[in-house]
């Protein structure tokens, strides 16, 4: 099922853990609508800006899958409102800054950020169509959350961390 021009339901629900453990990761109609909103409001503008495919590393998670991976059963992933993503060839911090400055979102987290590894970690972003998006921006280094994104470092006109 196509959710938007470049994103399918299949890629939004793909989970190696669900496959390995035989967990049903099928969303309901409300979650599918939320995933579509996420595609149109966040993912399509992101893909258009960088003109590169966006890799969804984690999208929708059923409550059973959330439990299996130690996540909250009612996380925004379980509501179809959040994805974890990367863009091959684009430092994750650069992706996070672009999202912060260009789309409406509820929560943006630079996950497992390591300034010495621009390709390390991933970007978590959530959206809900209710109009009450918090615009919360956090960085998680593997131990603690801090408000905001780390400063980007530039060298030769490119982001290095």
Tell where the protein language model's regions lie, with residue ranges.
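Extracytoplasmic cell-surface/polysaccharide-interacting catalytic and binding patches
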Residues: 1-49, 142-161
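A generic structural signal for short, non-catalytic loop/turn and secondary-structure boundary residues
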Residues: 49, 78, 118-120
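Structural recognition of the beta-strand scaffold that forms the well-ordered cores
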Residues: 55-57, 82-86, 124-126
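Short, flexible, solvent-exposed loop/turn segments with mixed acidic/basic and small polar residues
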Residues: 68-78, 113-116
């Amino acid at each position: 099922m196509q959710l938007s021009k470049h994103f399918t339901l299949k890629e939004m629900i793909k989970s190696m853990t669900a496959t390995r453990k035989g967990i049903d990761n099928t969303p309901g109609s409300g979650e599918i609508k939320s995933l579509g909103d996420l595609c149109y409001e966040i993912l399509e503008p992101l893909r258009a800006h960088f003109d590169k495919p966006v890799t969804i590393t984690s999208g929708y998670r059923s409550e059973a899958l959330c439990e299996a991976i130690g996540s909250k059963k009612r996380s925004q992933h379980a509501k179809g409102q959040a994805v974890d993503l990367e863009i091959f060839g684009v430092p994750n911090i650069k992706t996070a800054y672009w999202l912060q400055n260009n789309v409406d979102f509820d929560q943006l987290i630079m996950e497992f950020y390591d300034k010495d590894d621009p390709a390390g970690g991933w970007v978590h972003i959530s959206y809900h169509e209710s109009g009450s998006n918090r615009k919360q921006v956090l960085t998680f280094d593997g131990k603690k959350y801090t408000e905001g994104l780390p400063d980007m470092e530039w060298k030769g006109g490119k982001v290095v961390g």
